[in-house]
Amino acid sequence: MHALYKQAAALTEEVIAAAVMVQKHFGIGALESIYVRCLERELELAGHKTSREKVIKINYRGMQFKENLRYDLLIDDCLLIEAKSCEKENMDIWRMQLLTYMKLMDKPLGLVINFGNEHLPTRGVKRVILKGADEETVSF
């Protein structure tokens, strides 16, 4: 099991509740950046550490370079958020985008949150789990 998986999983309900609160305040149709900043504020008020950008090292065939990742939100260094504000959903594309960030940053769990979906808690949120992050390892 990924070292941060349980911590990230424990945060998901709180993050979804905060997202619902933000969506109720602004309704559907606000800019994605507004939703993200307000979600970040809700989580900071609840005592969580947040960030929205990180420089990471990429290694490829003997070449090493730094890349600036502009993910939407990272909470307590373990849960990644990909926020959207669209009526038409492209959930597969959004999940792949989030999964790419999760792999590059070695984060076990992420949430795609579509503030444009009026049924946010049930149909507007998708969990994305890094392969193997939620599995127990058995040693013999």
Sequence positions of predicted segments:
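Solvent-exposed, charged helical/coil patches
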Residues: 1-49, 126-134, 138-140
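Conserved catalytic cores of phosphodiester-cleaving nucleases, focusing on short active-site segments
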Residues: 27, 71-87, 101
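Amphipathic alpha-helical interface surfaces
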Residues: 35, 39, 76, 94-97
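Short secondary-structure capping/turn micro-motifs that flank functional sites
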Residues: 39, 59-60, 118
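Short Asp/Glu-rich motifs
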Residues: 42, 62-63, 121
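A short acidic/basic microdomain associated with nuclease active sites
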Residues: 44-61
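A short, glycine/Asx- and small/polar-enriched loop/turn
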Residues: 64-69
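Nucleic-acid nuclease catalytic cores
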Residues: 84-137
